[in-house]
From Swiss-Prot:
Keyword Chloroplast: no
Coiled-coil residue windows: none
Biological source species: Protochlamydia amoebophila (strain UWE25)
Protein name listed in UniProt: LL-diaminopimelate aminotransferase
InterPro entries, per database record: Aminotransferase_I/II_large, DapL/ALD1, PyrdxlP-dep_Trfase, PyrdxlP-dep_Trfase_major, PyrdxlP-dep_Trfase_small
MF term (GO), any: L,L-diaminopimelate aminotransferase activity
Amino acid sequence: MVKRNVHLTKLQSGYLFPEINRRKNEFLKKHPSAQLINLGIGDTTQPIPLYISEAMQNFAKQLASEKTYRGYGTEQGSILLREAIAEQYYQGKIDPQEVFVSDGSKCDVGRLQILFGSDATIAVQNPTYPAYVDTGVINGQASFFQTSTKQYQRITYMSCLPENNFFPDLANLPKTDLIYFCSPNNPTGSAATNEQLRELVQFAKKRQSIIIFDAAYASFVRSSHIPRSIYEIEGAKEVAIEVGSFSKMIGFTGVRLGWSVVPKQLRFEDGHSVQQDWERIVCTFFNGASNIAQAGGLAALQKEGLQAIDELSSYYMKNSNILKKAFEECGYKVYGGENVPYLWVHFPQLTSWEAFEILLKQSQLVSVPGSGFGSAGEGFLRFSAFGKQSDITVALPRIKHALLKIKPTVY
């Protein structure tokens, strides 16, 4: 028989969200009439704006005609969409040839691991989006999991806590080849300032590292001092790859469309172009994003589409403001929720799973345990504001009922 991939054996038994679903379904079996409200997984709930969905519909209709049918597109993506991303999203700071359209930023995160190989060392924020770690493990960039620390050997974990404003102490970090950094951040809801990102870019230059910058939630940024892209920082093109996503921006979580930016200036240790190798990987592993999805993405970056993006972002951020106020009124410390619709709530007397179970059983609310994002997430829950406002309104009295019962001690 064929031996199992040894790297897959290193993965922990349950990915975070399947475990949440298991506990949720177990609760529903015991309480079939319960009306659960999901404030956990960050899936969108508002429909794709009509202007954008009509663009996809019109493209799909063209596929039914011999005159207008189109098959394979280019692996790198439609040049019209690449130009629109470069112009509208990056204000011309990025060359369209540096943009690679994909089926989502999560897929790009996995393929980027292949670009750098199993010998590459990686650093991740702690807490962090699980895909950065798990794709690294699968690709052989980690050793075995240590139960005592709840961390993988060979991976550097950058502690991001309220005490350091969710920005790591870079001076005390060892050199790694890759630095994964997400801002605005999932799960903590924090967003790095211009000053912090300048420090990160300078650190990467000094250590000769490459930053993988996840900007999936950039469309929600409201503060003028918060960059939407790493390329707003001088010198970032020399040390950073950025991934972006249409998923939360226009409700494309089920459509699947994203992009990566690999600047021409980015080089390997031997001077070879990173972009050239990335293009080879894209062309080898990927046949290009759906033409229909790309038609929607192109529409989203026109005047009417950009207005729809702003309206959608405002809708979810209003939810975030409502939820944040409710938690704070009950005496809880709440982080995030200002530049991304995620709230990071501290439960100082409980473990993350204990807090999860209390809210599930007492208030029929589903959240995400912070410990699932890393050891630094213990004692926190992540709440998503991507729900419907009607559900948020119904959830408020339930939240207050449960929280007041477990009201925290003075911080």
